[in-house]
UniProtKB/Swiss-Prot annotation:
The active site is at C127. Belongs to the acetaldehyde dehydrogenase family. GO terms for molecular function: acetaldehyde dehydrogenase (acetylating) activity; NAD binding. It comes from Geobacillus thermodenitrificans (strain NG80-2). Its EC number is 1.2.1.10. It catalyses: acetaldehyde + NAD(+) + CoA = acetyl-CoA + NADH + H(+). One of its GO terms (biological process) is catabolic process. CDD domains: ALDH_C. The keyword Protease does not apply. Keywords: Aromatic hydrocarbons catabolism, NAD, Oxidoreductase. This is Acetaldehyde dehydrogenase.
Amino acid sequence: MAKVKVAILGSGNIGTDLMIKLERSSHLELTAMIGIDPESDGLKKAKTKGYYVFDGGLKQFLSEASELADLVFDATSAKAHVRHAKALREAGKMVIDLTPAAVGPYVVPSVNLGDYLEESNLNLITCGGQATIPIVHAINRVAQVHYSEIVATIASKSAGPGTRANIDEFTQTTAHGLEAIGGAKKGKAIIILNPAEPPIIMRNAVYALVECEQMDEVAIARSVQETVAYIQSYVPGYRLRTEPLFEGNKVTVFVEVEGAGDYLPTYSGNLDIMTATAIKVAEEWVQHRVKAASV
């Protein structure tokens, strides 16, 4: 099967890590990196590796070499993606959105990936969303979650300008994802940037208040374990810190994410889960497209 050509929009930490990961993909061929800072490490590395490099932003890419990619990963910011989405849609490009812009439908691979493969813009919510929404969904499969609250703690060093610019969108988009995808009737999200040295890996606390009459500790624990195993198939550093904890109708789950160390330090699990998920979604989209074409 021929690989699908892709481009990365955004030459920061996430875009550069994505570039390294794409080298291992059997379905995706990176052709170009697009940025606005010619001195960025991402654009410099991309040029060294022989990829096409555009430092005039998306406008330059679309006007000069749009044919280089059928799919574009947007690793910029939520505000920028709103503009990018329109231009990429008009250019007929498939888009995987790694910002909290939520222009397209929310996608969490373990929950609803197959539902939106005909869409042209898929949103990956946030790092906290990818780490915690599957857990809420796993609990909700067994017992209705009336309220869910998640606290995502990440190393301050792993939060670059893009992450810091997206804090408000992070909390809003993640909270909505807990409800729309996780199934909670009400969701709340909190993000903490921890300045500790040495930097900590990403840690997430998931709290869920469930329907008392539906509480089944064994079934909930099994459902959570199944979800964790699925996520580990594409994010190996994702794991439970402890077994799920139960108190009355409250379920508490602690998960952590250690990065693969491709471009980013291993403590940057919050960024790693986004890049790994982006590739998972893109590869599933490619396989879906191939199957559809063969029918």
